[in-house]
């Protein structure tokens, strides 16, 4: 069993702060080709996660926020924003399925 606790969050956040991209993954899956990727992604202010999608094979994503807040945008095929929201667990917005 792998427990998500304050120590894991703090350690992953410390690594994110040292990363040039200001983010760091903690992978729960063993291999990148596992059918489901399970990870904790510590993202610090100033980082940018480019719009992307997983097509081969098609995969949905779920974002669950444990700390902080983040803006999430959905785009159409032409790159226009179709949906947007702010996730912030302190305000009751904990996650989004994309």
Predicted regions and their residues:
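Short acidic-glycine-tyrosine-enriched beta hairpin
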Residues: 62, 76-98
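Conserved short histidine dyad/triad with adjacent acidic residue
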Residues: 40-59
């Amino acid at each position: 069993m792998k427990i998500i606790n304050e120590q894991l969050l703090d350690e992953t956040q410390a690594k994110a702060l040292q990363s040039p991209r200001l983010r760091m993954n903690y992978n729960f899956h063993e291999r990148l080709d596992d059918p489901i990727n399970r990870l904790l992604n510590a993202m610090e202010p100033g980082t940018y996660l480019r719009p992307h999608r997983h097509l081969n094979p098609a995969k949905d994503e779920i974002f669950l926020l444990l700390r902080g807040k983040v803006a999430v945008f959905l785009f159409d095929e032409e790159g226009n924003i179709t949906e947007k929201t702010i996730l912030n667990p302190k305000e009751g917005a904990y996650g989004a399925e994309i």
